[in-house]
Regions:
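Short, low-complexity disordered leader/linker segments with a strong preference
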Residues: 1-57, 337-340
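N-terminal (or domain-start) structured segment
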Residues: 34-135, 185, 198-221, 233, ...
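Hinge/capping helix and adjacent helix->loop/strand transition within the periplasmic-binding protein
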Residues: 53-54, 106-111, 126-210, 259, ...
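Ligand-binding "clamshell"
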Residues: 109-110, 126-139, 198-199, 233-244, ...
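Ligand-binding pocket segment of bilobal, Venus flytrap-like solute-binding proteins
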Residues: 174, 179-181, 185-256
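C-terminal lobe and pocket-closing loops
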Residues: 230-298, 323, 327-330
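Mature extracytoplasmic/periplasmic domains
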Residues: 294, 298, 302-323
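Extracellular/periplasmic bilobal clamshell ligand-binding domains
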Residues: 317-340
Length: 340
C-alpha cells in the first residue's frame, strides 16, 4: 500500500454529534427515528410468502447521526408504518465496517437481521482488512443513493480547488488529508492525489465527527465527507467543498462541483445503500424485502424524508443490487490496482 497511516492526535475540545459512512467505536442500539408515520400505517398488503416473526435488526457499520445511520432510520420508520413490524437500527461501528459485517455473517439467515450500508464491505476486502466481500452475503434490495463523497477544506486556509492544489504542490507530502485504511474514502483520496498530481500526508483522523473537529481546529487540511454531514459548515462559511468525483454535478448537492467540471479527470463510485443478508438466505425472505423497499419508496412522505437529508431515493431489486455490487467492487479494485 502507498503508505502507512498514522493516527492523528485530536486536541480540540468541541463535541460534535455526527458520524460518517464508517467510523470506530462501540456498538449501540437505537429505535427508528421518530416522526409521523405513513398514512398507510400497518395496512400494507404484502404478497410475499414470508413475513418477519418479531423485531428486525438493521445492523449499521457506523455511528449514529451520519448518512448511513439516518437513511437506515428512515427506512425503519416507514417500513414500520407500512407493516406494523418493529425495525431497530443497531450501530456496530469499527474496523472499517468489519465489526458489523461479521455480526451479520454470524447471524441466523432467518431474515430477522441484515447489514445496511454501501460498498464498504468491498473496500475493506480490497484493502486487506477482511477476507470477504459482497459475495459472502445474500444481496437484498437497494434503498437510497448518496452521491460520492466530496472533499472539503477549511475556508480560512483555502479559497478553492486551485488554492489547495497550489499549496499541496508547494509543500509535497505535508498537507494532511483525513481518511481511514479500508474506508470508502481511502482509495478516493489516493485516486484524487494521482488525478491532481499532488502528494498528501494521509492520517487516520477517526470518524466523521473526529474529522470535522480536526478540520475546524486546523489539524488537517482536507477531509472527505457526505454532503449532509458538511452542509451546515458550508453554509456557515467554515468549509469549502473543492469538488466531488461525480460523472456530473447532482441537483441534490448544489454547493458541490464535479471535479470533471473543474478540469480534474476523477470519478469515484457513489454510496448506494443496500441490504446484505447472511449467506443462503431463503429467496422468499429476499422477495419480502424487495417488495417492502419498493412500497416504502412509493410513499411520497418517505421520498421527502430522504431528499430532506438530503439523500436520493434509489431502488434496485436484489438481483440488480448484486450486479451493482459487482460493478462497484471491480471499479474500486481497478482503482486500487492502479495505485499499487
Amino acid at each position: 500500500m502507498k503508505r502507512k497511516l498514522f493516527a492523528l492526535a485530536l486536541t480540540a475540545t468541541m463535541v460534535l454529534g455526527l458520524a460518517a459512512c464508517g467510523g470506530s467505536g462501540s456498538s449501540t442500539a437505537a429505535p427508528a427515528a421518530g416522526g409521523a408515520e405513513s398514512s398507510a400505517a400497518g395496512g400494507a398488503e404484502m404478497t410475499s410468502e414470508w413475513a418477519p416473526s418479531g423485531t428486525v435488526s438493521i445492523v449499521v457499520p457506523a455511528g449514529a447521526g451520519g448518512d448511513t445511520d439516518l437513511t437506515a432510520r428512515t427506512f425503519a420508520q416507514y417500513a414500520k408504518g407500512l407493516t406494523g413490524v418493529d425495525f431497530i437500527v443497531v450501530n456496530a461501528n469499527g474496523a472499517s465496517g468489519s465489526v458489523a459485517s461479521n455480526q451479520v455473517l454470524q447471524s441466523a439467515n432467518d431474515g430477522m437481521t441484515f447489514l445496511y450500508g454501501h460498498t464498504l464491505v468491498n473496500v475493506a476486502n480490497i484493502a486487506g482488512i477482511t477476507d470477504f466481500n459482497y459475495t459472502a452475503f445474500t444481496l437484498g434490495p437497494t434503498f437510497a443513493k448518496n452521491p460520492a463523497q466530496g472533499l472539503y477544506v477549511n475556508a480560512e486556509k483555502y479559497a478553492d480547488l486551485n488554492a489547495f492544489i497550489e499549496a499541496a504542490k508547494a509543500a509535497p507530502g505535508q498537507l494532511k488529508a483525513a481518511t481511514e485504511v479500508g474506508a470508502y474514502t481511502y482509495y478516493e483520496i489516493l485516486a484524487f492525489e494521482k488525478a491532481a498530481g499532488i502528494d498528501l500526508d494521509l492520517v487516520d483522523a477517526g470518524s466523521n465527527s473526529d474529522k470535522i473537529t480536526a478540520m475546524l481546529s486546523g489539524q488537517i487540511d482536507l477531509m472527505p465527507g457526505a454532503y449532509l454531514n458538511c452542509k451546515e459548515y458550508i453554509e456557515a462559511g467554515q468549509f469549502v467543498c473543492i469538488g466531488a468525483p461525480y460523472e456530473e454535478a447532482y441537483d441534490i448537492t448544489p454547493e458541490v462541483p464535479a471535479f470533471k467540471d473543474e478540469g480534474i479527470d476523477f470519478v469515484y463510485p457513489d454510496c448506494d445503500y443496500s441490504f446484505y443478508f447472511p449467506a443462503d438466505t431463503d429467496p422468499a425472505i429476499i422477495a419480502y424485502y424487495d417488495e417492502l423497499v419498493a412500497k416504502v419508496l412509493e410513499d411520497p412522505e418517505a421520498q421527502k424524508a430522504l431528499t430532506d437529508l438530503p439523500v436520493m431515493p434509489f431502488y434496485l431489486t436484489s438481483e440488480e443490487s448484486a450486479a451493482n455490487e459487482e460493478t462497484m467492487y471491480n471499479t474500486i479494485k481497478e482503482i486500487a490496482d492502479s495505485l499499487a
